Amino acid sequence: MAFQQHGNQEVRNRKILQGLEEKKRQMMNQQQGGGAGPLPGPSHVARPPTDAGNTSASRIHEPIVRYPNQTHQLAISQRQALEHAHSVSPGFYITQDSMYGNLILPVIPRVESE
């Protein structure tokens, strides 16, 4: 009798796993543009102003164009970089979307002089 209950649990577990795999496949298709609807338009992220004497200043004022799936990938990259930095360094880091491509920045506390 216990064997039969174990078999039923196995069948339920397989059905749950199959359902999860199907949902995963559907989500992957939607992310890759295989979804039923069109992809949402790009989101614009304005860059911060820089020094006017810089020769590349005109380029920097252009907005960064990102599509939603690129933003998701950036978030994954930031999280991985942050976890790696925390695991190999005793310092404290924050995620930052900088115009120089830095995914994380170290936080350096201010120490008041005595």
Swiss-Prot record:
<dbReference type="GO" id="GO:0006281">
    <property type="term" value="P:DNA repair"/>
</dbReference>
<dbReference type="Pfam" id="PF15925">
    <property type="entry name" value="SOSSC"/>
</dbReference>
<dbReference type="GO" id="GO:0005654">
    <property type="term" value="C:nucleoplasm"/>
</dbReference>
<feature type="compositionally biased region" description="Polar residues">
    <location>
        <begin position="1"/>
        <end position="10"/>
    </location>
</feature>
<dbReference type="InterPro" id="IPR031821">
    <property type="entry name" value="SOSSC"/>
</dbReference>
<protein>
    <recommendedName>
        <fullName>SOSS complex subunit C homolog</fullName>
    </recommendedName>
</protein>
<feature type="region of interest" description="Disordered">
    <location>
        <begin position="1"/>
        <end position="61"/>
    </location>
</feature>
<dbReference type="GO" id="GO:0070876">
    <property type="term" value="C:SOSS complex"/>
</dbReference>
<comment type="similarity">
    <text>Belongs to the SOSS-C family.</text>
</comment>
